[in-house]
Amino acid sequence: MWGYIHLISWVAIVVLTVTALLIYSKSTKSFTMLQMINRVFYILVILSGIMMVKYSIEQSWILAIFKILMGIIVIGVVEMLLSYRKQQKPTGMFLMIFVIVVVITISLGFYLSGGYPLFN
């Protein structure tokens, strides 16, 4: 169950972040609302990650710690990306870092979980 919550929350964070970046020029109110919803999903990701960490540590404790750090970095990069967008500063570098870090984090997550919940 926690795997599904974790996966759905990560997908929601990515979708909300991309949506917020795309609609900023049209509606700052909607941008702020999406940013707040994103923060709720951060809490879900952190809680579900805590519940699943014991299974990841059984697989490889070094990779589990690395994945935890990468997850924290993703949240930080998303916050920086959205705050730079709100301040109308260039976001290209953070967007590139966001894509790279998300791909690494997702890959580690599926490796440590043995593909669960998508590839049972």
Curated annotation (Swiss-Prot):
Localization in the cell: Cell membrane
Organism domain of life: Bacteria
Keyword annotations: Cell membrane, Membrane, Transmembrane, Transmembrane helix
Pfam families: DUF1516
Regions that span the bilayer: 3-23, 33-53, 62-82, 92-112
HAMAP family associated with the record: UPF0344 (MF_01536)
Organism: Listeria monocytogenes serotype 4b (strain CLIP80459)
Gene Ontology cellular component annotations, sorted alphabetically: plasma membrane
UniProt topology in membrane: Multi-pass membrane protein
Record NCBIfam families: PRK13673.1-4
InterPro entries with a match to the protein in the record: UPF0344
Primary location recorded for the protein, binned into one broad class: membrane
Similarity annotation: Belongs to the UPF0344 family.
The name this protein goes by in its record: UPF0344 protein Lm4b_02292
